[in-house]
UniProtKB/Swiss-Prot annotation:
Protein name as annotated: Autophagy protein 5
Keyword entries, A-Z: Autophagy, Isopeptide bond, Membrane, Protein transport, Transport, Ubl conjugation
Homology family: Belongs to the ATG5 family.
Record has Transport as a keyword: yes
CC annotations in GO: Atg12-Atg5-Atg16 complex; autophagosome; phagophore; phagophore assembly site membrane
Topology of this chain in the membrane: Peripheral membrane protein
Pfam families xref list: ATG5_HBR, ATG5_UblA, ATG5_UblB
Lineage of origin: Eukaryota, Fungi, Dikarya, Ascomycota, Pezizomycotina
Cross-link Glycyl lysine isopeptide (Lys-Gly) (interchain with G-Cter in ATG12) residue location(s): 159
Subunit (UniProt): Conjugated with ATG12.
InterPro entries, per the entry: Atg5, ATG5_HBR, Atg5_HR, ATG5_UblA, Atg5_UblA_dom_sf, ATG5_UblB
Functional note: Involved in cytoplasm to vacuole transport (Cvt) and autophagic vesicle formation. Autophagy is essential for maintenance of amino acid levels and protein synthesis under nitrogen starvation. Required for selective autophagic degradation of the nucleus (nucleophagy). Also required for mitophagy, which eliminates defective or superfluous mitochondria in order to fulfill cellular energy requirements and prevent excess ROS production.
Post-translational modification note: Conjugated to ATG12; which is essential for autophagy.
Predominant cellular place of this UniProt entry's protein: membrane
Length: 311
């Protein structure tokens, strides 16, 4: 199988990846004595919970204590931890669900919608709580009723990724209005046929060589007191990741992690203390970062990698 075919298959698997969700209204926001019905959905890993708020508002409206609440007042939590709605669902799941990631040495690999043996240790669907009051403004960015905030944050992230890749960010700035609209429509509709042509333009700018690769690392962060430790705090780490290292050798996940987090990744070849998890799977340290960017990056062009401690 050619490298192009491998890339295409990986891209397809990642695009079709999803997480079954069971979303329930918080008891303090529910007007009935018993819990309201749960909202069940198979939601794309690449997408954003913020894109669900209007459907959830309509579904739970009959059960709300204050039915005239605005959709922008809704927010999600998991086991008491507010979930950042501008993080892709897959990243949130990898960070907080507690599910064991799939390892390349395991066989057979799970399908995009079927949990692996490791996932079975964490009950599915992933059970989230929807709130309509007490919005945690110190932890979450405020939403708006027209999805303008999530649109703006997404486009800003796309521009950041483009700036790192090209050094200018002009590829995004020079997109036509039609292309920019199509990119966002592809995100909202989760439509690969709309997304791929624009994504290929961003990844392959004419006459420009890639300079750096957009990678963000997310680490569990222990607070200074018990209260902080219980809030699922995460530290985001970012550094310039070159396309090549040494004598024009491709940058690998192992060399990048050894550069950015040498304490957790003292070896470039073997995971000793922590693992890099992307789309629910442990990333081999020998994997090329550029190839991952081209095949399995999130919709904004970034590799959002969860760092999971071993043992």
């Amino acid at each position: 199988m050619s490298s192009r075919e491998v890339t295409s298959r990986l891209r397809e698997k990642v695009w079709n990846g999803s997480v079954p969700l069971e979303i329930r209204l918080h008891k303090g926001d529910c007007r009935t004595y018993d819990d309201s019905d749960a909202y069940l959905i198979q939601f794309p890993r690449l997408s954003y919970l913020a894109l669900l708020i209007h459907k959830l508002h309509a579904f739970f409206a009959p059960s709300l204590i204050y039915p005239d609440i605005h959709p922008s007042d809704l927010w999600f939590s998991y086991e008491g931890v507010p979930l950042k709605w501008h993080y892709p669902l897959g990243l949130l799941y990898d960070l907080y669900s507690g599910a064991e990631p799939y390892h390349p040495s395991d066989s057979p690999p799970p399908s995009p919608t079927t949990p692996s043996k490791q996932d079975s240790k964490q009950p599915l669907p992933w059970r989230l709580t929807l709130h309509t009051s007490a919005y945690p403004t110190t932890q979450l960015i405020p939403l708006d009723n027209n999805n303008l905030q999530i649109h703006d944050l997404f486009i800003h992230s796309v521009k950041e990724a483009d700036y790192l890749r090209t050094g200018t960010g002009k590829t995004v700035m020079f997109l036509s209005q039609a292309d920019s609209t199509q990119l966002w429509d592809a995100v909202v509709k989760h439509d690969f046929a709309l997304f791929n042509p624009i994504n290929q333009k961003l990844l392959n700018p004419q006459g420009v060589n890639l300079r750096h690769l957009p990678v963000r690392l997310y680490l569990p962060h222990a607070g200074v007191d018990e209260e902080d430790r219980g809030m699922g705090s995460v530290r985001v780490v970012q550094s310039l990741v070159k396309v090549e290292v040494g004598s024009r050798q491709p940058q690998t996940i192992g060399t990048a992690l050894n550069q950015i987090l040498p304490t957790l990744f003292p070896s470039r070849r073997s995971a000793l203390l922590a693992q890099a998890v992307l789309h629910g799977a442990v990333v081999p340290l020998g994997a090329s970062v550029e190839e991952l960017i081209r095949s399995v990056a999130y919709l904004d062009g970034w590799l959002h990698i969860a760092i999971v401690m071993m043992g």
